[in-house]
């Protein structure tokens, strides 16, 4: 049995794992996912932290998780990030993701990646530092959040091809910063993140 699975099963409760993607980028939304694994299936053995997986493997696991687990996705766009700051926007996205799972089924506890409990969430929860490499449910949520956000940035790149969103996914790479200095921001950029660059 995988250690990630053991970690979850030790709780002896119905768990929802929560993680986010996109707290650091200069553009695009922050995306949160909440995942409840109803029944263990063999392919879950391949899951670990989404950052350690290839893009192709993440995509394959994403499809399986969506098909076989209870999944909720929450989004806070760049406008909301600018209005309430990235941490609060992340919590908003997480609450939206959990609400979508809650609309489908009941659960006992939320395990959230990181060292912050979700603000204004009144259910039972626990913050798990490096949770995406400890908990199977959080690792699954990590994959769903990352793939969902990456796909959104690819779509944004069709509207604004000159920014190369499909390559850097909105992160502050050298290329992205150079394009920003040359062209200025588009509507998907987080204005509150650009003060040190522009």
Q: Which residues fall in each region the model found?
A:
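RNase H-like, Mg2+-dependent phosphodiesterase core
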Residues: 1-198
């Amino acid at each position: 049995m995988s250690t990630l699975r053991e970690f979850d099963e030790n709780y002896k409760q119905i768990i929802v794992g929560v993680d986010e993607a996109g707290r650091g980028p200069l553009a695009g939304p922050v995306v949160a996912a909440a995942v409840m694994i109803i029944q263990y299936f063999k392919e879950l053995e391949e899951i670990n932290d989404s950052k350690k997986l290839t893009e192709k493997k993440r995509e394959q696991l994403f499809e399986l998780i969506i098909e076989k687990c209870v999944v909720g996705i929450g989004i806070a766009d760049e406008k909301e990030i600018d209005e309430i700051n990235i941490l609060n926007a992340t919590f908003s996205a997480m609450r939206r993701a959990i609400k979508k799972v809650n609309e489908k089924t009941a659960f006992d506890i939320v395990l959230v990646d990181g060292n912050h409990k979700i603000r204004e969430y009144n259910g039972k929860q626990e913050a798990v530092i490096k949770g995406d490499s400890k908990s199977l449910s959080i690792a699954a949520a990590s994959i769903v959040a990352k793939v969902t956000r990456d796909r959104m940035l690819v779509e944004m790149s069709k509207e604004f091809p000159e920014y190369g969103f499909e390559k850097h996914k909105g992160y502050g790479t050298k290329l992205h910063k150079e394009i920003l200095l040359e062209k200025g921001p588009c509507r998907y950029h987080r204005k509150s993140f650009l003060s040190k660059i522009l």
